[in-house]
């Protein structure tokens, strides 16, 4: 059986429905031909030029990312801009690009739940429920600890679990953590929801000074593990879901995880 782009779109959307995306978001097939056959799939967090080149080199004509390459409507597509160069190269090499973003964050067993599991916990509740969801879904998860941890212990667990060199945090290292919220990626818009839930700590990425300063004053610890650090699980989630679905269909289309999609930040 030949796998077409439209078949792959249906598989992804069956697991992470487009209806679950946040209103500001853009998800789905970004570039491509729904009737084209899929030879091989590459998964990545971002559709960088390095990822595109890797897909070409490894004969992958389908790239699936978490972050949409077309987040905002471009005013033009030319070789004068980075985005234009990417899209032209994608089209010139007959590559299809699909993105599952906040819908993959929200869905049950999506990125939020994957992050909780990676941290070593198996029970959580939804932080901000998605009212459009037929089943339970929403942004962020709240974990109630059966045994308290100190902030230092939680920071150490985050570093070890996410395999990151360093992180930023606020709060007393000896602070007792009874519950915490996980909001992968840029989670500041949901900090207030976390505060209302009474959590002692928020784990996220991409925090800004004034937000953290305010929540520090409110005695809520914040652990900033970076945008890449908290969202690389998206690649793992998507790859496993696709492998399982294709196996059931008797399709052996190769699925490769990009080796070129790395955190742009370096640390000294």
Curated annotation (Swiss-Prot):
Enumerate the UniProt keywords alphabetically.
Metal-binding
Q: Which InterPro entries does the annotation name?
A: DUF34/NIF3 (IPR002678), DUF34/NIF3_sf (IPR036069)
Question: What name has this protein been given in UniProt?
Answer: GTP cyclohydrolase 1 type 2 homolog
Signal peptide range = none
> A Pfam family matched by this chain, by name?
DUF34_NIF3
Transport keyword on record: no
Q: Which residues bind a divalent metal cation 1?
A: 66, 105, 231
According to the record's subunit comment, the protein's assembly and interactions are: Homohexamer.
Q: Where does a divalent metal cation 2 bind?
A: 67, 227, 231
């Amino acid at each position: 059986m030949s796998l077409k782009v439209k078949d792959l779109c249906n598989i992804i959307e069956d697991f992470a429905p487009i209806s679950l995306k946040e209103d500001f978001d853009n998800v789905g097939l970004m570039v491509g031909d729904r009737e084209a056959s899929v030879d091989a799939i590459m998964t990545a967090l971002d559709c960088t030029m390095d990822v595109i080149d890797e897909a070409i080199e490894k004969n992958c004509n389908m790239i699936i990312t978490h972050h949409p390459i077309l987040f905002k409507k471009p005013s033009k597509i030319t070789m004068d801009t980075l985005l234009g160069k990417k899209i032209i190269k994608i089209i010139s090499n007959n590559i299809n690009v699909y993105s599952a973003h906040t819908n993959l964050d929200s869905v049950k067993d999506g990125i939020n739940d994957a992050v909780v599991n990676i941290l070593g916990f198996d029970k959580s509740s939804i932080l901000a429920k998605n009212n459009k969801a037929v089943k339970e879904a929403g942004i962020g998860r709240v974990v109630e600890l059966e045994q308290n941890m100190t902030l230092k212990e939680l920071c150490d667990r985050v570093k070890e679990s996410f395999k990151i060199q360093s992180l930023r945090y606020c709060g007393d290292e000896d602070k007792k953590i009874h519950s915490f919220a996980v909001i992968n990626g840029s989670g500041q818009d949901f900090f207030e929801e976390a505060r209302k839930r009474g959590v002692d700590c928020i784990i996220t990425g991409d925090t800004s000074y004034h937000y953290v300063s305010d929540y520090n004053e409110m005695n809520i610890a914040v652990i900033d593990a970076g945008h890449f650090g908290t969202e690389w699980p998206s690649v793992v989630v998507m790859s496993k879901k696709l492998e399982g679905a294709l196996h059931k269909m008797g399709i052996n289309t190769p699925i490769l995880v990009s080796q070129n999609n790395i955190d742009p930040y370096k640390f000294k």
